[in-house]
């Protein structure tokens, strides 16, 4: 019998975490079905999921479709199969036993998306979570659900009705920026995102090396996020864009933002069109 909750996990070479990730869903106090969408893993992820979690719905992509496109496959499945809630769970993350139940109980009051308190594997608040949400948690220290302007998509509980309104992830983003853009569109449609204090979950991403060039490329994605925000002035963002990237280049002593500007110049028509498409209800999934 199908439950009300579908947990979607997008995988790519996920063997390091899969037992804890999927096992935590199996141990949840709220029954949740699992869907794994694999982006061409080469470490045995597919075989492990089929063997250890035979009840999970498994989808094998023909190529690495990226985080957003792979999640859209799961979102469409959830909508067509009558689920009430979707939980987007990173492959390097896991939930506490009562996490999903606490979040479902906290929905309401205009929230279209909720996150638990996100910790690292050592039990400390995840650094990015604290940086993005910490001051709002401190400001509303008596509130069980704290409104925040943004929270990372490692752990999202989303009612399927939210996807009918906001849509899925934009195809413009293949790696990073998808969650920023989705929340911009969530706000555009008058919905809120929040953090549930009584729900806890882990995002295990400490101690992963990353080159300066890669870090700078990821910083540059923030420019695409701003251009894609349906609530912002597109022309104004285009005018600011060169100065923003130049400042980023000077501050970080890197040529990556300048090279990124050349790439981005050819993308402007596509970004403008996709931004308009993103305003429609159910964008990118219907």
Name every feature range the model reports, one short phrase each.
Residues 23-32:
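Short, acidic, metal-binding catalytic loop of nucleotide-sugar glycosyltransferases
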Residues 150-158, 162-167, 172-200:
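A short, conserved alpha-helix in the catalytic core of glycosyltransferases
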């Amino acid at each position: 019998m199908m439950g009300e909750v579908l947990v979607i996990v997008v995988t790519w070479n996920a063997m390091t975490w899969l037992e804890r990730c999927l096992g935590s869903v199996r141990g949840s106090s709220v029954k949740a079905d699992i869907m794994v969408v694999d982006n061409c893993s080469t470490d045995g992820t597919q075989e492990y999921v089929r063997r250890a979690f035979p009840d999970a719905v498994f989808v094998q992509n023909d190529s690495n479709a990226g985080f957003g496109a792979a999640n859209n496959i799961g979102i469409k499945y959830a909508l067509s199969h009558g689920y009430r809630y979707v939980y987007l769970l990173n492959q390097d993350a896991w939930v506490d036993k009562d996490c999903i139940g606490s979040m479902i109980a906290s929905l309401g009051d205009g929230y279209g998306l909720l996150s638990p308190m996100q910790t690292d594997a050592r039990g400390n608040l995840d650094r990015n979570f604290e940086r993005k949400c910490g001051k709002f948690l401190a400001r509303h220290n008596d509130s069980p659900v704290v409104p925040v302007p943004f929270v990372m998509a490692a752990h999202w509980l989303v009612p399927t009705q939210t996807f009918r309104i906001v849509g899925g992830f934009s195809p413009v983003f293949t790696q990073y920026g998808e969650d920023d853009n989705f929340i911009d569109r969530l706000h555009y449609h008058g919905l809120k995102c929040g953090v549930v204090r009584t729900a806890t979950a882990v995002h295990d991403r400490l101690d992963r090396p990353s080159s300066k060039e890669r870090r700078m490329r990821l910083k540059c994605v923030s420019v695409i996020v701003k251009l894609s925000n349906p609530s912002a002035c597109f022309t104004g963002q285009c005018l600011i864009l060169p100065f923003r990237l130049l400042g980023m280049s000077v501050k970080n002593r890197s040529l990556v933002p300048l090279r990124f500007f050349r790439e981005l110049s050819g993308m402007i028509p596509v970004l403008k069109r996709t931004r308009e498409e993103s305003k429609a209800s159910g964008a990118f999934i219907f």
